[in-house]
Regions:
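Extracytoplasmic/lumenal acceptor-recognition loop(s) of multi-pass membrane glycoenzymes
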Residues: 81, 85, 462-487, 499-568, ...
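Periplasmic/ER-lumenal interhelical loops and adjacent helix-loop junctions
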Residues: 46-59, 91, 226-227, 234-324, ...
């Protein structure tokens, strides 16, 4: 059947404009601050500064230049797998391709405003079916666009892509099941999948919950035929959008961060009791900065997106709705989601049962909460009956947070203190803003609820309050790191030309950084040891821990691990000038100051070993395990690590490393090892957009080592003939070459991309035929309104 709300004039573009210009007003003051005192474009904190700005700038240039292998990504990684989680499937990223790469930092705020506008419009489109009143449906969209989840995740930026697109898929599902509309659902499934495969896994779980709750609430009534068509459209949409899924899946299966299952009680209970308190208050208080802990100090709280706050109205409308409409599907959905939030294994179901805690799926029940709130408010009699009590309960529960500021305790010296909070001022700001919202809502309810334009008044108040609390959140997050990030632009964007002029371009080499910001390699288009990206080549994750470097979300080898720099062909370290004294105090061997830029002192590595060299000896895994992880790099400068099969194949080319050499780890020995590796270097090495080439001219057969992360996507040829690639040193590469002059070529093709692209292309063709069939059928039924 065709529902009546579609006959009403859509206010989509009004909601879009309201959300867009509210976002403009939200960011404008902070953009002005950055223009005047921050060095230029808007920068924020943490991931936004260290990842999102430079990812967008770098990916923009990389896509336009073409290629498959990114040398500037850590030690080198496949471009598709490194950036598909962050931006490569995002329609907002592809829209930004009209902007020159050099101007991308200035495009970040307009893109954020656009995402919030798209989110608001999508929330409105989904809500208007259920709310059945245009004004209140518009409010639902605005609440969704400026929820605590949206404001919090400005920090991560690309999470907002998911927030923006999800409501359209949910609305298309409703249309397909309730109104028997065909054709739209596969499109939105495909777009959400290609946008972000990680979040899509959670969306699939939520859609299943939503579907069964709708069926249980008798809003979804479908027979076998309609169910089969829905299954067909779902599969078709997944096939259309799988272009990045297979490559990502093949990579993630090798990534240790994605394989972290629960055990025992971990399935049922969080390890810290305070986690439950943090989840509970996430619906009541506006969110704190992502990198702070406020009310609770124990548990996994930072960077988890743990917030379900709605501006001004809070959770009161949702509580009242659930009491008033106990058998409504929204009530079922919200109750199931609450259960999921408090049970670890259910929470992790949105992340393929990974035991790492995140709340990054909350935007989906938040959308339902917005719909439930506006459903209640659009029915005056129902709201009059249920809302006051829920508002009083919400007020009381919010006030209980004060306990954390006054509860008595003891400090480290045994003195009596009040409160368990580290930053009282920050807490009172958050608590005060939250209570201000409750008071404003209560006053508006008391004085305006019977006015004819009550919905418009409340919408204006929600948008106005979103500016207030959103600006407070931005300020708490941004300016708490002002001293750290005030030189961000000077060390990155403004230093591109200076660094390019200061560094020689006579050979391939890596750089390192000390006391500087993350991901300098992306700005300067060079491989840099300090790198912040969760989805780099999996072999990097395997290699670094074996040489004493923790590798989780980023690579940060300590400067004291100086031998690692020789092994990985690091020629220069860029030392931030305000950290130069700290650097020189370390007195690391082999570094000489050779120049400077406005932001950096340049130190050259006297023990630099150009990329590509051979060894005289090999070392076994058993031998290497006798050496502490932090000192293994020095042994690997002396001998290549081979497994038993490789020793059988290449043992005749190399001598086994004597055991006494395992203890010879002096600075002089390191310098001698580097000199020996330089002498055994390849004749030429050239990095390309698809891998690299090298030339050799050895007198004997050799196993040539390259400190490039091993990847199944690489294929190698020697003199045009296919050659086997050896995985050595727990994650790097080597290839056998015969004596004499040889040309080596390593070419990278993203594993699975060709297959997934073919599947997507075929599915899109099928989808086109499917749409054509729908159109022809409609035209053959002139009386149909569909």
């Amino acid at each position: 059947m065709q529902t009546t709300f579609f006959k009403q004039k859509s206010n989509y573009w009004r909601v879009f404009a309201l959300c867009f210009f509210t976002a403009v007003l939200l960011f404008a003051p902070h953009c002005i601050v950055d223009a005047v005192a921050g060095g230029g474009y808007f920068h924020y904190a943490g991931d936004f500064n260290d990842q999102q700005i430079n990812f967008y700038q770098y990916a923009n240039a990389f896509v336009k230049n073409g290629g498959s292998f990114s040398w500037a990504t850590d030690l080198g990684s496949g471009f598709v797998n490194s950036y598909s989680f962050y931006l490569l499937g995002s329609p907002f990223f592809w829209l930004s391709m009209v902007v020159p790469a050099r101007l991308m930092p200035w495009a970040m705020v307009p893109l954020l405003c656009l995402k919030m506008a798209v989110a608001g419009g999508g929330g409105y489109l989904w809500a208007r079916r259920w709310v059945r009143d245009e004004t209140w449906s518009m409010l639902a969209g605005c609440l969704y666009a400026f929820s605590g989840f949206s404001i919090y995740n400005i920090f991560f930026n690309h999470f907002l892509d998911v927030v923006a697109l999800f409501p359209y898929m949910l609305a298309a599902l409703d249309d397909a099941v309730i109104d028997d509309k065909k054709g739209a659902f596969p499109f939105w499934v495909a777009l959400n999948l290609v946008d972000n495969y990680f979040f899509f896994a959670g969306q699939a779980v939520f859609l299943i919950i939503y579907f069964f709750c709708m069926a249980a609430g008798r809003r979804y009534e479908l027979g076998l035929r309609k169910f089969a068509r829905l299954a067909w459209e779902t599969a078709l949409g997944c096939a259309c959008g799988c272009v990045l899924l297979l490559p990502a899946g093949l990579s993630l299966l090798q990534n240790p961060r994605t394989i972290d299952p629960f055990s025992g009680y971990g399935y049922l209970f969080y390890g810290k009791s305070q986690q439950y308190g943090a989840i509970f208050y996430s619906t009541l208080l506006m969110p704190d900065a992502p990198y702070f802990k406020d009310l609770f100090q124990e548990g996994i709280l930072k960077h988890t997106s743990l917030t379900a706050y709605l501006p001004l109205v809070g959770v009161a409308g949702g509580l009242a709705f659930c009491r008033a409409r106990e058998r409504h599907p929204f009530t079922y959905v919200l109750k199931v989601c609450v259960a999921c939030a408090f049970v670890p294994v259910l929470n992790s179901a949105f992340y393929a049962l990974n035991s790492s805690y995140y709340a990054r799926w909350y935007y989906m029940p938040i959308l339902v909460l917005c719909g439930a709130t506006c459903y209640l408010l659009s029915r005056p009699a129902l709201a009059e009956q249920r809302l006051p009590r829920a508002l009083r309960l919400t007020t009381f529960l919010t006030l209980t947070a004060v306990v954390f500021a006054v509860v008595p305790g003891k400090d480290d010296d045994g003195n009596t203190v009040f409160g368990v909070l580290d930053e009282l001022a920050r807490f009172w700001a958050i608590f005060g803003m939250t209570m201000l919202g409750i008071v404003i809502f209560a006053l508006l309810w008391h004085f305006c609820r019977r006015k004819r334009r009550w919905g418009a008044i409340l919408t204006a108040a929600v948008l106005g309050f979103s500016l207030l609390y959103g600006s407070l959140h931005l300020s708490l997050t941004k300016y708490a790191q002002w001293d750290v990030d005030s030189n961000l632009i000077a060390e990155t964007y403004d230093s591109v030309e200076d660094v390019a002029a200061a560094l020689p371009d006579d050979a391939f080499y890596r750089i390192d950084a000390y006391g500087a910001h993350n991901n300098l390699g992306l700005w300067f288009n060079r491989s840099c040891l300090q790198f912040f990206n969760s989805t780099v080549a999996p072999s990097i994750m395997a290699f670094y821990p074996e040489v004493g470097v923790k590798r989780d979300v980023n690579s940060k080898p300590d400067a004291e691990n100086y031998a690692l720099r020789g092994l990985l062909s690091v020629r220069y370290t860029l030392v931030a000038k305000d950290k130069e004294t700290e650097w020189t105090d370390k007195d690391l061997p082999g570094w000489q100051r050779t120049g400077e830029t406005d932001a950096y002192a340049l130190y050259e590595n006297e023990n630099w070993v150009p990329m590509g060299f051979t060894y005289d000896c090999y070392v076994t895994a058993d031998q290497l395990e006798r050496v502490s992880e932090e000192e293994r790099a020095q042994i690997l400068c002396r001998a290549i690590l081979l497994d038993d099969d490789q020793i059988s194949a290449f043992g005749s080319l190399l001598e086994p490393l004597p055991d006494e050499e395992l203890t010879n780890r002096s600075e002089d020995a390191y310098a001698a090892d580097c000199a020996a590796r330089r002498a055994a270097g390849v004749a030429a090495f050239t990095a390309t957009d698809t891998g690299f080439t090298a030339k050799t001219a050895y007198d004997t057969d050799e196993l040539v080592f390259f400190s490039v992360p091993y990847d199944d996507g690489f294929s190698a040829t020697v003199n045009g003939e296919p050659a086997a690639i050896e995985k050595v040193d727990d994650g790097l590469m080597a290839v056998y070459v015969p004596a004499g002059e040889n040309e080596i070529e390593f070419t990278y093709h993203t594993p699975g991309l060709k297959v997934s692209a073919c599947v997507s292309a075929a599915a899109i063709a099928v989808y086109g035929v499917y749409l054509l069939g729908i159109i022809i059928k409609r035209k053959s039924q002139p009386g149909s309104k569909r």
